[in-house]
Amino acid sequence: MAKGESKRVPEHPHWYEDLPERDAPLDRAPKMVHGDVNAMDAICLEISRASTLMRGLGIAFGLVSVAGLIFFVVMICLVLFPLEPDLIVPLAISPLLAAMGVWIAFLLLKTDLSIPRDRPVRLNRTQRKVYVYEHAYGMNPFKKWPTTVKVFDWDTLQAELHRQAGFNGKAYIQRFSLWLVSCKPGTNEVVDRFELKGNHPTRAELYDAWAYCRTYMEHGPEGLPVYPPRRQEVTFRRSFFEYLRFLDPTEEGREERAQMTASEWILNSIVALLAFWLLFPMGIGHYIAMRFAPEVKWPPEIDAESRRGPSHRAEAASAIGG
């Protein structure tokens, strides 16, 4: 259940809960979801958002759409001769149905193949700036979807949880996401929002991630859990087990299993039993998507600016203002 109403306006339609303010006392140990840290030093923390998108779903359903479209065209050709009077109306609307099929197939395939392999977020604690690598996408698959970088002042950001839920025919599923909200200074009027972490079945890891970011920006990496850089190599084995990592028979799977709590074992086992028929094909689609997806390329000036230390703050501020 949502906890009342958000303090921020306008409220997001999927809003669930406002999280503690940036400078509020910590009520939990700060930690990140395993594998979500790309890099961290005394100046910059780079957080991966690769796990937020369920890559492979568009490939799987896109290929099914293509197969269905081919079947539809073949069936239309078979019934053209001889042409019966009661087939005139279905044949008249068949071009529209075919066009819709092409649009859906292209949209699903492009969504998976064009979005970069990651959309990282950099927190620069010395400049108190947040750099968000974004890729715009929409409903027109034939239009170019640009990649942009948004820059926010840390002191204008707050956090909130969003929730989406529904019934998939077999089970009731809910997913939570952590969003950062930029407000006008001294107000709760929202200027912009961006998703920091998403696609989580529970809230605990998102609370921990917000605590981790707050601690890093105020105190640096000292005292924070240190994680190895996220594995970024693309292999068929890693993609195949992307959504059921605990079943991976290699060392990576053993590491995942070693960190799982009893409740996570129960939850993951239920998901595996109910959805393996979808998640393994999605893993194959994930491999195809990651092979074709563009790599992350920060604009050179933003890349340098987001890594700069305190001696460059004036120069960075001048560049942003200009």
How would you describe each model-predicted region?
Residues 129-130, 140-166:
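Phosphoinositide-dependent membrane-docking surfaces
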Residues 122-137:
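Membrane-cytosol interface motif
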Residues 40, 213, 220-262:
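Juxtamembrane amphipathic/hinge helix adjacent to a transmembrane helix
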Residues 46-118, 245-322:
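Alpha-helical transmembrane spans
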Residues 163-176:
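Short acidic, Gly/Pro-enriched loop/turn segments at secondary-structure junctions
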Residues 177-216, 222-233:
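Canonical phosphoinositide-binding patch of PH/PH-like domains
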Residues 1-37:
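Short, non-transmembrane cytosolic segments of multipass membrane proteins
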Residues 38-53, 176-178:
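Short, hydrophobic/proline-enriched secondary-structure or compact coil segments at domain edges
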